[in-house]
Amino acid sequence: MRSKTITFPVLKLTGQSQALTNDMHKNADHTVPGLTVATGHLIAEALQMRLQGLNELALILKHAHWNVVGPQFIAVHEMLDSQVDEVRDFIDEIAERMATLGVAPNGLSGNLVETRQSPEYPLGRATAQDHLKLIDLYYSHNIEAHRVVLEHNGHLDPISEDLLVAQTRSLEKLQWFIRAHLDNGNGNI
């Protein structure tokens, strides 16, 4: 039996709704007390890149959660789901900090693809070990990127710095859980 081609509806923005999109990412003319608008917006721009990196990480973790197979399935499947939740919390914290700094966060898929800093996740259905080896690399990338923002902008705003320090600590812990599955018992992954 041949399946029929499904035609899905396509949303088209017209008139007034189209005009609304022109100002979608308009920034405020203010920021938090103690920072200049320029400094607040500079910090928020760096946070936007971290927002995008963490959005991608959350999508990768959920994708692997759905596609992991093999003897470690249930342990890894459940671990990844809890990690998705934690990374999504980080995304929300960063977006809210950006808004507080007066910049509209952009978590839309088009922006994610346009500004991505890592290659497309190459695995579909695969073993836990294969997924975890790749996820470890994506965690390393995100941890390094958080550290770069801290190095360049941490001194400008201690509040954003604290947020990124706490997230980096948690990302390192989540990566430790991944690496515990990869460790050969001699401390090698």
UniProtKB/Swiss-Prot annotation:
Keywords: Fimbrium. One of its GO terms (molecular function) is ferric iron binding. May contribute to bacterial adherence, or be involved in the protection of the bacteria, or both. Signal peptide: none annotated. It comes from Haemophilus ducreyi (strain 35000HP / ATCC 700724). The gene is ftpA. PROSITE patterns: DPS_1, DPS_2. The keyword Heme does not apply. Coiled coil: none annotated. GO terms for cellular component: pilus. Belongs to the Dps family. Hexamer. Pfam families: Ferritin. Gene3D superfamilies: 1.20.1260.10. It is found in: Fimbrium. InterPro entries: DPS_DNA-bd, DPS_DNA-bd_CS, Ferritin-like, Ferritin-like_SF, Ferritin_DPS_dom. This is Fine tangled pili major subunit. It comes from the Bacteria. The keyword Plastid does not apply.
